[in-house]
Amino acid sequence: MPHTPPAYPAASADHRPPSSPPAEPAGEAVFLHPGDWHFGDSQTRIRTLLGSCVSITLWHPQAKVGGMCHYLLAQRTPHRGESLSGRYGDEAMLLLLREILDTGLPLQEFQARLIGGASMLLSRERKLSHDVPSRNIQQARLMVKQLGLKLLAEDLGGNCPRMVLFDVASGNVWIKQSQEAELEQAPHTRTRK
C-alpha cells in the first residue's frame, strides 16, 4: 500500500477532515500540464501530476487568491531574450509574481507551499541527467527565501509521483502519492504557457 503524505490545510469553513478534499469543486477546475501555471480567485481549484517537476503554490489568506506553477527545470541557460516560459522555475515564479503585482496585494502576505521533485530515475541515470529533481527543489527553496515568502509546508523528494489539488478558496493543498494507472488518467486540456 503506498504511503500517503499528510495534507497541509489552512483555515477553512469546511468541517471535514483536512485529509479529504471537498466532494464538489467550487468553480473553475484547472489542470496544469508541465510548463503551465495558473492564478485565480476563490472559485478556482488547480490540479496537477508531478514527477521530477516541482509545483509552487502561492496563496493570500485574506483575499483568497492564489496560483500554482508546474515547472520542469530550475532555470534556462542561456536565456536569449525569449518570452518567459513556465517550463523553468525562475521564469514560472516571475509569471506568478506578475499576477500578484496586478492584485496590488503585498507579496510578503502570500503563503507558499512546495511540492514535487521526486527522483523517478535510477541513481546512475540521475548522474547522467544532472539530478534534475534536486536542482528543481533547490530552486524552489531559494526563490521562496529570496522573496521573503512564508513557507507553510513542503512535500519534496522521494521516488513516487504525486497528484496535487490546490483549492484557492481555502488555501488547502491535498497531495496523494500516485500509481502508474492514475497518471494515465490526466486530462489533456491545456492552460497558460
From Swiss-Prot:
Residues 1-26 are annotated as: Disordered. GO terms for molecular function: protein-glutamine glutaminase activity. One of its GO terms (biological process) is chemotaxis. Disulfide bonds: none annotated. This is Probable chemoreceptor glutamine deamidase CheD 1. Pfam families: CheD (PF03975). InterPro entries: CheD-like_sf (IPR038592), Chemorcpt_Glu_NH3ase_CheD (IPR005659), Cytotoxic_necrot_fac-like_cat (IPR011324). Its EC number is 3.5.1.44. Keywords: Chemotaxis, Hydrolase. The keyword Translocase does not apply. It catalyses: L-glutaminyl-[protein] + H2O = L-glutamyl-[protein] + NH4(+). It comes from Chromobacterium violaceum (strain ATCC 12472 / DSM 30191 / JCM 1249 / CCUG 213 / NBRC 12614 / NCIMB 9131 / NCTC 9757 / MK). Probably deamidates glutamine residues to glutamate on methyl-accepting chemotaxis receptors (MCPs), playing an important role in chemotaxis. Gene3D superfamilies: 3.30.1330.200. Belongs to the CheD family.
